[in-house]
Amino acid sequence: MDIPPLAGRTVAMSLGALPVSYVLNQVSAFSQPLCVVLTSALVLGLLFMAVYSLSHGEITYDPLYAVFVVFSFTSVVDLVIALQEDGYLMGLMDFYAKEGEPYLRTAHGIFICYWDGTVHYLLYLTMAGAIRKRKRYRNLGLYWLGSFAMSLLVFLPGNILGKYSSEIRPTFFLAILYMLVPCWAGMRIFNQSPAPSSCTCDVVQEEQKKSLLQRPADLTLIVYLILAAFFTVFRGLVVLDCPADACFIYIYQYEPYLRDPVAYPKLQMLMYLFYALPFYCLAAYALTFPGCSWLPDWALVFAGAIGQAQFSHMGASMHLRTPFTYRVPEDTWATFLLSNLLFALGPHLLALRCLWRPAFFLRAAPPSSPQDQGKKQQ
């Protein structure tokens, strides 16, 4: 399989975050929040100008190239912050974690940084490499879009509503501008033409004639979607303070992190309740009735969103930065990990199913009329 190479120029620019972080950390003036936000904007502006001057051809071909290069730089910064907060690095991003975005020092913030510095970073390099080679990256872009949007939709409101709301810095308003990026990038990615399907009309018609019992993989996914929907409703009721005994036992013995006043876990469960739950129902419908051509794209977006959300939620639930009373008890680790890993795995299996065997979701060609058949015979 021909995999797009990682863009070497993008790697070099992104790794420039290391010396830049070290130099800025040595300047005492950056102990002021206003200096931090102005410097951050200046660095990103200079980086964008450098990308534009060095890669004008790529940006002309696809403006998202500049976004991926700049964001790869910020991904390295996020990875440095996460490693520094966990004690693996020292003296690189102290000023930003203290005066820029102190909520990145929470357990949830640390795992957002880990995800951005690893998964997002590899996606940026791969998509930038695909643009340089003029190859398709639509599927990777959809996965990134869901992941990036989910992290913002939980993290930014959580900073305002949680116990760290009093520590909002001017840099927070710079982060709000990031919300415009997935909107614009999403429109461009969705407007890209999908890869041409190799399924013939006969294959599509034959696949769509099969009943659900003749498609055991789809039947298994539907059962999973139903169970995941019930689990989503249950955890939504838990964070909404449902007085049922089952909710009380769950929040104290299995996921006490849902009570943490940082607000991120509550917002995450509400995001699941209001957005993931409808998708589970619609996806089960699309696996039952043929021709739902929207599912393959949205399954990728949803897989990215759930992957990022579950990684951050599971990591923060067990991280030492979370107060002991809100951490998962050691005797329930197995149940917690199994249920949450399955919750994260299912959407990825759904996306893979849609990519590998898309015939069931394609719109069947209308049957040819007798006149058309007569013309073909002539």
Swiss-Prot record:
A GO CC annotation given for this chain: endoplasmic reticulum-Golgi intermediate compartment membrane
UniProt-annotated location(s): Endoplasmic reticulum membrane; Endoplasmic reticulum-Golgi intermediate compartment membrane
Transmembrane segments: 34-54, 63-83, 110-130, 140-160, 170-190, 219-239, 269-289, 291-311, 332-352
Origin superkingdom: Eukaryota
CDD domains membership: TM6SF1-like (cd21106)
InterPro entries associated with the record: EXPERA, TM6SF1-like
GO biological process, one term: regulation of lipid metabolic process
Membrane-topology annotation of the record: Multi-pass membrane protein
Domain EXPERA residues, every copy: 61-186, 217-351
Principal location class: endoplasmic reticulum
Single GO term (MF): identical protein binding
Matching PANTHER family: TRANSMEMBRANE 6 SUPERFAMILY MEMBER 2 (PTHR14568:SF9), TRANSMEMBRANE SUPERFAMILY 6 MEMBER 1/2 (PTHR14568)
Function summary: Regulator of liver fat metabolism influencing triglyceride secretion and hepatic lipid droplet content. May function as sterol isomerase.
Homology family: Belongs to the TM6SF family.
Protein name listed in UniProt: Transmembrane 6 superfamily member 2
Organism: Rattus norvegicus (Rat)
